[in-house]
Amino acid sequence: KVTEVKDRMFDLNETINWKPKATGEGRFGNWLKNANDWNLSRSRYWGIPLPIWRNEEGTEEILVGSVEELYNEIEKSIAAGFMTENPFKGFEIGNMAESNYDLVDLHKNVVDEIVLVSASGKPMKRESDLIDVWFDSGSMPYAQWHYPFENKDKIDENKAFPADFIAEGVDQTRGWFYTLHAISTLVFDKVAYKNVVSNGL
């Protein structure tokens, strides 16, 4: 919950070098003081599908945490008779090669067709909502390195994170600057960037 860390977000913001300084202290600082909890899901067609499958009654659910886990859950569904084949056929678990991941399509139109099986043997369909696209933007600094699955040294040893410098329009104080800062505070308890140039619209 953002409201539980908004004071920490404010404190961390004071360590960031903002140009102009007034944007960091004023516009962004005031936004952080009044930060509300962030609704992670959106009812849209584009974006990252929430990896949650539920039975029709809503009494059982599975939260899938990786492609490997989804692959294995699909295999269980095939064995239970809810699916006839694995759409990720040929995918090699543990192989992080780009060519291997090219076999996996996690777009909404694909994953919405995946039916999983609950612990009690009932069919489960995916939650229809998506993750807010701002979450994608805010997690970019480490997601681009496939962290935490690969390249841990780049993030854990501060080689590629936090960023030395970012720049965007002043409107991003409530967009990209905010989501970078919020996610970094929640996940790492540190800033996502050291220096910011905020220009006009």
Model-derived features: positions:
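Structured secondary-structure scaffolds
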Residues: 1-201
